[in-house]
């Protein structure tokens, strides 16, 4: 017995995953945009009596919208315990030793833009913002509103706290801020996430479509095998020519349950394994998609040795067979392959048996002639 497994796989066009890849590519334009960071080269001088100690280095980073230019002045923190300068009434004690001064403000409490606005309204030429406690000397480029001709720099918490405490002890501290090196940051966390997601998505689509392609090829081979087996085994069903005097053409005789027409002389009928017979041109298109007898629902294909297993979630066998084998064993082809010469007034019934093909697909039909004496 031939055991065939039948399933359908709907092949999606390549445009679906190409569209998804295009969307990912468009999203990547924002993720892959280079991030430019300008470092601040600072020369900090500590005036202690007649001594001046200087400290040089790239200790800060310019804000995103900061003016990139050189600026110098005395560092002045806000008065009072609160050093975030979020209050518009914040007071800065300007030094009498310099016309230009730089506001030293602690991060937090409000936006960077609000801090810068308060300091510039008080006359600051630049703003130095130091990070919150617990961050060490970590810095990052701040996002803030652009202020004309105002330099905005961030320094680490340790350095900012050190400067603040020295100023509170009466040490005069000045700073010269110059534009340092430019850093282009390509590999940020957005880009890394995008690369990981894109790689995983592309790998999924590639393996998914390769898998679907392999399944489609296997399915096509199964259908070809099923078609061949049906052609070979369907020939085992007998053909008969209805003649004058047969009981089928009597007024009380049966009619074909498919076309509802009575049998006439010289009609070719096919006899199923359950002994029911029908017009050959009616039963052949029926038996292929249905596989059962129209009267008793006998599984003709199973009796002939073909068992069709339909997987869960697939279309019914009737739809599959009608779609895949629309021309298989059509009435015209059957009549060509199994030509039966109707007998005129002969008293012989001709049974034409179609043997299944051998491995080389050579069909060897043979006829069996039997003497039949009509009833008086």
Swiss-Prot record:
Top-rank EC class of the record's enzyme? transferase
The reaction(s) catalysed by this protein are: S-ubiquitinyl-[E2 ubiquitin-conjugating enzyme]-L-cysteine + [acceptor protein]-L-lysine = [E2 ubiquitin-conjugating enzyme]-L-cysteine + N(6)-ubiquitinyl-[acceptor protein]-L-lysine
Q: Describe, by residue range, where the zinc fingers (RING-type) fall in the chain.
A: 256-297
Q: Give the main location.
A: endoplasmic reticulum
Expression sites by tissue: Expression is testis-specific.
What keywords is this UniProt entry annotated with? Endoplasmic reticulum, Membrane, Metal-binding, Transferase, Transmembrane, Transmembrane helix, Ubl conjugation, Ubl conjugation pathway, Zinc, Zinc-finger
Please list the residue ranges annotated as the PA domain: 65-167
Q: Polar residues: which segments have biased composition?
A: 355-364
Q: What is its EC number?
A: 2.3.2.27
Region annotated Disordered, chain positions: 327-376
Q: Which GO terms describe its molecular function?
A: ubiquitin protein ligase activity; zinc ion binding
- One GO term of the biological process aspect: protein autoubiquitination
Subcellular locations according to the entry: Endoplasmic reticulum membrane
Membrane topology reported for the UniProt record: Single-pass membrane protein
Record note on modification: Auto-ubiquitinated.
* Pathway assigned in UniProt: Protein modification; protein ubiquitination
Classification via SUPFAM superfamilies? PA domain (SSF52025), RING/U-box (SSF57850)
- Gene Ontology terms: cellular component: cytoplasm; endoplasmic reticulum; endoplasmic reticulum membrane; Golgi apparatus; late endosome
Q: How does it assemble?
A: Interacts with E3 ligase UBE2J1.
Task: Specify the protein name.
Answer: E3 ubiquitin-protein ligase RNF133
Origin organism of this chain?
A: Homo sapiens (Human)
Biological classification of the source: Eukaryota, Metazoa, Chordata, Craniata, Vertebrata
